[in-house]
C-alpha cells in the first residue's frame, strides 16, 4: 500500500492541485454537459495531461435549508457523512478510522462540506485503472451509505459546542454575528449555529436531510481530469448508484428572498480590546444578477483590490486609520451581504467609520474614475489565468457554472465581459444595488476620541 501512496505523491495528489496548464487556461475550455437518465446533470472538462481526476457533486442541501431551531444541520450532516459507512450488500461497515485508512491506502480523498446554498462532495483520485475503480467504489459507499453513528455524533457535538463557545470570546466572531443578524434578519443566511441549536440536531435529522435532498435527480456533478465523456458518464452513474434510484424529485420548497433594509441600523458593542472591529454593509445581489461584471469590477476598485483600492488608499495610506480595509460581495442563490470591514484603534473608530461611509456613498453616487477603471480591469484580466491554473481551481469554476446555470462558454468570455464594463455601468449598478443611507453598522470595542485638552 505504501507503493500507492508513493505513486499518488509523485503525481502531485498531495500538492495544491494538478496543473491544468497556463497555456490551456488562456485557450478555450470546452465544457461538455449532459443529463443522465437519473436526472443528474453532468459537466466535464477533459484534462488528459496528468493522470488525475477531480469530481464535485453538489446538492441543494446547504444551510439555507436548515430549520431555525436546528441551525448547523447542514454542516453536521456533511461532517458526519465522512465518519462512518454502513454495512450493506455483503460489505462490512467502516468506522471513521477504517474509512480514513482506506482513503490513505488509495492515495485519494473524498469529503463533504456545506455552504449557505449547497452541500458538496469532492473526490480526488489518480486515474490509473485499478486505483480509479477502487476510489469510485469507496466514494459510492460513503456517499450512498453513511452510517451517522450516534456515539460519534455525541462526541462531535460536544467538540463543536466547545469550539463555538471559544469562538464566542473572539471580537471578530462577535462582530460578525451581530452584523449577519442585522443584515439578514430572519433569513436562513443569517442563522447562527450555537451549542443550543446543535442540541436540537440528532442523527435522525441527518438521515432525513439525506433522504430528502441527496438524490441522483438533484445532483449537479462537475468533473475535471483525465477521463473522456463515456468514462465520466459511467463514473457518475457509479458514484450515485447507492442513492435512492427513481425517487420523486418534486420541486423543493422555495426559500424566501433576503428582505431589503428599510432604515439604517447601528449597533455598538462594548469590548475591551486593542483594536475596534468596524463592519458596514447591507444585502447585496444574487449571483444571477445581470450586472455581475459591473459589480465585480466596481468592488475591485472600491475595496476588493487590496492596496490599489480606493478604501485602502484613503483610509490607510492617506489617513493612517487602519492597517487594512476592504469590501466584498457574497452573492448566492439569494442576495448575499455587501460588507466593508476594518480594524482600528478604539479612539479612531468613529473617524474611520465616518470616512468609510463617505467613501462608499461617494462611490455609489459618482462611480469610478477612468484611471481606476482601467487599473482594475487590467488587474482582473491579468490575474485571470491564475484562477484556472490547477485542476482544483478549474473544478471550482466548472462547479460554479453548473450550480448557477451559467453559459458553458462563461470562462471563454470572462475577460471580454470584464473589458466591456464602463464607468457608467459601475455607477448605475452600484446605485441600484447599494443604499448607503440604509446600511447596517456594527462597531465592537470602539469609543469616542478623548476631547482635546
Give short role names for the model-derived ranges:
Residues 10-24:
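Bacterial N-terminal signal peptides
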Residues 43-44, 51-54, 64-67, 288-289, ...:
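Short, solvent-exposed loop/turn elements at domain surfaces
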